[in-house]
Curated annotation (Swiss-Prot):
Protein family (similarity comment): Belongs to the protease inhibitor I11 (ecotin) family.
Name the UniProt record assigns to this protein: Ecotin-like protein 4
Organism for this UniProt entry: Trypanosoma brucei brucei (strain 927/4 GUTat10.1)
Superkingdom of origin: Eukaryota
High-level lineage: Eukaryota, Discoba, Euglenozoa, Kinetoplastea, Metakinetoplastina
A single GO molecular function term of this UniProt record: serine-type endopeptidase inhibitor activity
UniProt xrefs under Pfam families: Ecotin
Cross-referenced InterPro entries: Ecotin_sf, Prot_inh_ecotin
Cellular-component GO terms for this entry: flagellum attachment zone; paraflagellar rod
Amino acid sequence: MFGSRKASRRRSYRSRSTMGSRVDIDFCKFEEPPSPREGERRCLFVLDPLEHYVESKDRMVELLPGRVETVDGVNTYYINGCTTEEKFPGLDYTCYRVDLRDTYRSRCAVPPEATPEEKFISHRHRKLIPYNSRKPVVVYLPEDAQLHYRIWTGGQEVVAKKAEE
């Protein structure tokens, strides 16, 4: 019983080649988004299907674009930039374009014995988007960037009480 439900939701990928071609994944059908611009790459993924009420009321996706950089292990690092929404003609879903700029760090003194390390540094202003398994998440990034994401789950609603006087 458990296995049969999961097995029916497995994704089947078909080849994706040009704009206008149809991509079918069991629960998510969509038109191929445009190719990335020069100096960019495209990340495309679909989310696991959930009940409609859960998707619309209880889940959000946080996009975490960033780069792997050498850091000192002491300071806090972040990348400036912006994430914008784009609608393309013929597509019924939103695409996102990320512009990553300079990396900044806090100004803590670094001890001489600290060793530099490679670490993923994320964009300072993260984007929360609605969870929707029926549409793909398409993000255009600079070639040297990576995309991480988190699924946020809402908790139980709590009614705020009036402040006592």
